[in-house]
Amino acid sequence: AFTNVANGGVYSGATTAMLTITAPPVSFSTNQYRCIVTGAAPCAAQTSRVATLVVNPLPVIVISATAPRSLLPGLTSTFTSTVSPNPAVTYSWIRNGVVLSNPALGVVSGLGTGSIIVDVDGMGDYQLRVTDVNGCTNISNTVTIKDSASGKCFIYPNPTSGKFQVRYYSVANNVLPRTLTIFDAKGDRVLTQFYTIGRPYDRMDVDMRAFGKGLY
């Protein structure tokens, strides 16, 4: 049986020509509605056709990351996701509250899909925003990728054709000047470069293609 609706809760405009239903729960799906219009005498009341409400559930998104979640230079972690109950159409990865777009520092591959690979430049808090086949959007849980403190100096690729990177641990947000000095096999200094470091394992690029082959 039909019952009259009143303003309040999800309903507004109950006695106007337009009934608005705001953020109804999924349990409202398949509810049927009709409108009765009453005119001045001698006009009789008129009842509309029945309209059926469809409420699609929000997607439930769960993300996880493979070990290790505390990264050293050269290591990666892979994020995967599950979306239910309906298939996803679009994927937007979020790091520290900012939606990532190509190219994104620290993301090796996968933006725009349900799985991404991140390296040591991609530290932060990750979420995934999904829109499903019904146009419903939701955001996942949060997974954090951290640095792993080490006293080692990382140099790669090695061997190299002349261009390589050097990484050494620094405390996050501690902006430091750093001097990099390279010596040849005889112990002679052949190159000195200066860098400003602000993140753990900030990348220091070196180009020695102008130097001869050998051990340094």
Where are these regions (language model features)?
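Solvent-exposed loop segments of extracellular immunoglobulin-like
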Residues: 1, 83-92
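Solvent-exposed segments in extracellular or luminal domains encompassing
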Residues: 10-30, 106-123
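Conserved structural position at the C-terminal beta-strand
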Residues: 37, 130-132
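Short, exposed coil/turn segments at beta-strand boundaries within extracellular/luminal domains
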Residues: 41-47, 133-139
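Interdomain boundary/hinge segments at the C-termini of tandem beta-sandwich modules
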Residues: 51-57, 143-149
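Proline-enriched interdomain boundary motifs that mark the N-terminal boundary
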Residues: 57-66, 149-155
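A short beta-strand segment in extracellular, disulfide-stabilized domains
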Residues: 74-83, 163-167
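C-terminal outer-membrane/trafficking sorting elements
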Residues: 90-99, 149-156, 161-216
